[in-house]
Amino acid sequence: MSVPKFKRLPSGLDYVDNAYELQKEVMILASKLSARWARIYQQPIDEYACKQADFVNMAHSINIQSVEDYITRRWLLKMSRAYLQVLEKRLMDAIRILYMNPSKCFSRKNGKNYTTSEATKMLDRRLEVLGTMFDRQYTLIKGVLDSDNKKYKKRDYDNISDEEIIKILVSKYFQIIFE
């Protein structure tokens, strides 16, 4: 029996799947902001969530065959981690806003709002899930970087200078931008 398309995950790797799930959960939480605060916070939060998932997907698509591949993949994973840190900071700012009036964040199917205590509990549960997802993503990215380092050291590549690394990164960056 096959899995329906809407239930399929984009990849079989944990760090890619977790990035996708994290992006989805962050966007759901950001959509709970009121219209006034959504104009300020929602677009950057959605952008950072998408960027961190995109960088993970790009890094996943690189199979390490050469020094260039290793450097590019490492750079993409570090950019994903940087976007993850910025996303976490921005999301915490938005969460402070949500906690100022939690009853307006969630509404029932009939359109009425939850009480403040119910809404606070719902927000706490959602934040707990997000916190574990963030921690897991940090751990997974660190694990991928460590395993890439081990593979790189096993292959015994020639020592490459910092200038060559910069040239490789700049060329790959512009190649990614113009594709």
Predicted regions and their residues:
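Amphipathic alpha-helical assembly/interaction segments
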Residues: 1-179
